[in-house]
């Protein structure tokens, strides 16, 4: 592949200030890698000789596996960090851990941490030390999860424009995002990427899980609109896409929800509830899924409506694109 001359970001930390052109670069690059993955070779030497280090301070299965596979498909060498068996248990700081992997020759850090801001901190320190190391945020606390936001964007655009996924296909589309907005870094990344792409995003959830701060967000000029609903029906009416989010019980304090059964009664997504959406509506979920809570099992397994497995497939191509763009950006 040739260098993407118009790509200038040294780190991918959030999606708050991305331009539409940058989103399209990622989508175009991911489309190329999707074609590679569907072919016989499945591997390219784009990052041969570079080292990608996965610094996951928080448990992860699908994101870590997806990044590891993406790096290997680009022919990069991969190192994986596990906090339970690391020197963190002996008092080592996060920065010293990063410096240790830096000394081993890391070129790209993929960082997940339960505390918001850690990837930004490591990126700032790598820049201060003039290391040339790139940082990719794989999810930090309740802040953002940019690669998930981009893979969701790619999955959705691939539905509306399968031959050439680009953000223009989302102009004026209505996308409902339903569930635990309060604790969701996925929701935050998605609302930035989708509105920048021109879609109108409708957030829906119980008042305890949909804070008023989202109503006060300032979007870039020309972006789609953002709406908040404490009832499900207005968000679903006329929706082209419905994204449901996991209830993050591990992050919740008491009394945010009466019960999981009551949540499903008011906000669970089912075939019946989708009748008010646009014909051909599709459903996404970033996973892992609580079946029968956020979404019914029947709907989740419906190949005509559910794009959940498509999201997993898109994830590898998008992460290949992001690693490639960071690994080939000119300083």
Curated annotation (Swiss-Prot):
InterPro entries: Asp/Orn_carbamoyltranf_P-bd, Asp/Orn_carbamoylTrfase, Asp/Orn_carbamoylTrfase_sf, Asp_carbamoyltransf, Asp_carbamoyltransf_Asp/Orn-bd. Heterododecamer (2C3:3R2) of six catalytic PyrB chains organized as two trimers (C3), and six regulatory PyrI chains organized as three dimers (R2). Belongs to the aspartate/ornithine carbamoyltransferase superfamily. ATCase family. Pathway: Pyrimidine metabolism; UMP biosynthesis via de novo pathway; (S)-dihydroorotate from bicarbonate: step 2/3. L-aspartate binds at residues 90, 185, 246. The keyword Kinase does not apply. This is Aspartate carbamoyltransferase catalytic subunit. GO terms for biological process: 'de novo' pyrimidine nucleobase biosynthetic process; 'de novo' UMP biosynthetic process; amino acid metabolic process. Catalyzes the condensation of carbamoyl phosphate and aspartate to form carbamoyl aspartate and inorganic phosphate, the committed step in the de novo pyrimidine nucleotide biosynthesis pathway. It catalyses: carbamoyl phosphate + L-aspartate = N-carbamoyl-L-aspartate + phosphate + H(+). It comes from Synechocystis sp. (strain ATCC 27184 / PCC 6803 / Kazusa). One of its GO terms (molecular function) is aspartate carbamoyltransferase activity. PANTHER family: ASPARTATE CARBAMOYLTRANSFERASE, ORNITHINE CARBAMOYLTRANSFERASE, MITOCHONDRIAL. Keywords: Pyrimidine biosynthesis, Transferase.
């Amino acid at each position: 592949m040739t260098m993407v001359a118009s790509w200038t970001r040294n780190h991918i930390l959030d999606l708050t200030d991305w331009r539409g052109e940058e989103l399209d670069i990622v989508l175009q690059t991911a489309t190329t890698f999707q074609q590679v993955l569907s072919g016989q070779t499945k591997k390219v030497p784009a990052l041969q000789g570079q080292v990608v280090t996965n610094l996951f301070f928080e448990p992860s299965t699908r994101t870590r596996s997806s990044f590891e596979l993406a790096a290997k498909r680009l022919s990069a060498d991969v190192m994986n960090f596990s906090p339970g068996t690391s020197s963190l248990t002996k008092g080592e700081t996060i920065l010293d851990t990063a410096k240790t992997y830096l000394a081993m020759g890391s070129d790209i850090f993929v960082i997940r941490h339960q505390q918001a801001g850690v990837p930004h901190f490591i990126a700032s320190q790598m820049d201060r030390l003039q290391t040339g190391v790139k940082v990719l945020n794989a999810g930090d606390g309740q802040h953002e999860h940019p690669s998930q936001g981009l893979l969701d964007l790619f999955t959705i655009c691939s539905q509306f424009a399968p031959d050439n996924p680009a953000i223009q296909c989302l102009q004026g589309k209505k996308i409902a995002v339903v569930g635990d907005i309060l604790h969701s870094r996925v929701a935050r990344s998605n609302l930035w990427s989708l509105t920048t792409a021109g879609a109108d995003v409708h957030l829906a959830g119980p008042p305890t899980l949909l804070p008023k701060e989202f109503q006060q967000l300032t979007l870039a000029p020309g972006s789609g609109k953002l709406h908040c609903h404490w009832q499900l029906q207005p968000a679903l009416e006329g929706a082209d896409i419905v994204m449901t989010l996991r209830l993050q019980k591990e992050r919740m304090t008491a009394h945010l929800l009466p019960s999981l059964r009551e949540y499903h009664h008011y906000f669970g997504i089912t075939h019946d509830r989708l009748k008010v959406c646009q014909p051909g509506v599709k459903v996404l979920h970033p996973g892992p899924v609580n079946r029968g809570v956020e979404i019914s099992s029947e709907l989740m397994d419906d190949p005509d409506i559910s794009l959940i497995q498509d999201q997993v497939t898109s994830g590898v191509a998008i992460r290949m694109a992001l690693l490639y763009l960071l690994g080939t950006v000119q300083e």
